[in-house]
Amino acid sequence: IDRTTDGSGWVKDYTYEELKKFNAARVKGDQFGFQPVPSFEEYCAWAKNQSLFTNVELKTSIIYYPEIEEKTIALIRKYGLEDRIIFSSFNHLSILRMKELAPEIPCGALVGDRGLKYAGFYCERFGFEFYHPDFQTLTEEDVKECKAHGVGINAWTVNGMEGLEKLVEWDCEGIITNYPEVPVKYFK
């Protein structure tokens, strides 16, 4: 929680009541005042009435949270968000479990800065509809290989215009960004 709040430590070591006491707007200084960490259910309730598509990243690669996949899917279904969600994780066993539980919801194989050799083949083989690489290591050859296997690409973390232009030129399906104003400005 150090990276995104004014708290310190691991999420697993706190109850939700304790997590709500941390300021999730810390990274923006005083711009938004105090913003408590929302629960995933609070997010789903809010998202239900918004016109948006959400990448739900399961943070299970370092610490595994028992039944996180089942609980996540239950909330997605409770709020009717199945057609506006994509699941991703660095832990590909976790997204394999998501595919077992909710085969109708697309999944993306999230990978670090080393990428995956033959990512399209890999994703197709495991039933993942998307490949989520670091955009800085993605090559045009990677894009072609994925497309040859019917696998879409959502690259991360695209925070500047130059990276966005390259991915649009390569006909990637989506970007993951910390600054939504960048693609909004580009596509205006």
Where in this protein do the model-derived segments appear?
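Metal-dependent phosphodiesterase/phospholipase catalytic core, i.e.
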Residues: 1-112, 126-129, 133, 147-149
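C-terminal active-site rim and adjoining tail of enzyme catalytic domains
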Residues: 30-34, 108-188
